[in-house]
């Protein structure tokens, strides 16, 4: 069975993604979904799948790393089967937190979405005020998904050190980078058994073509190289100003 699938978006990538998240929530019988809580530096636990329509994984701002907040959040529902919606950097951090024994990652259904980049908080607020609605910034970032999202030089400082903006390592990984998102998104699962459990053959729009998968991976490779050069340039600059 394929572990790479597509979702046809019909011009609405956010609505399509949220509906897919709601579907897998209901199919896996989650008790809740942990998401970032808007501008607040805290996690938020959704307990009704109908609330999924209010979240926006493409929102280009990040006030805290959700993985660092999860251990405390999970104490609220110690016996619950929960999902968590993460950016790639948060997924990597979650693995580290789990390896330190701060939480049991196997009690979570992890969902990771390609990151289109984030602005510094003050710039995000300024741009939102100019556009009159912060949702416009998410839509703008999505427009540039085929090219890699917002430009690296506009990222907040932490994002400039990012290893990769590609969704990887979660049980459900959603691809948007390098793709014509008004037409299609990709779904990647590392476990064929989960694909069968979710019945992806019916809730998706079929297996992803090798060309589409390669298209995303090619852009991710270029983005990772760009990020590496950016990190090296920043570190070289620091080396020049720090005392020897």
Residue ranges and their predicted role:
Residues 1-243:
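Iron-sulfur-associated redox domains of electron-transfer enzymes in respiratory
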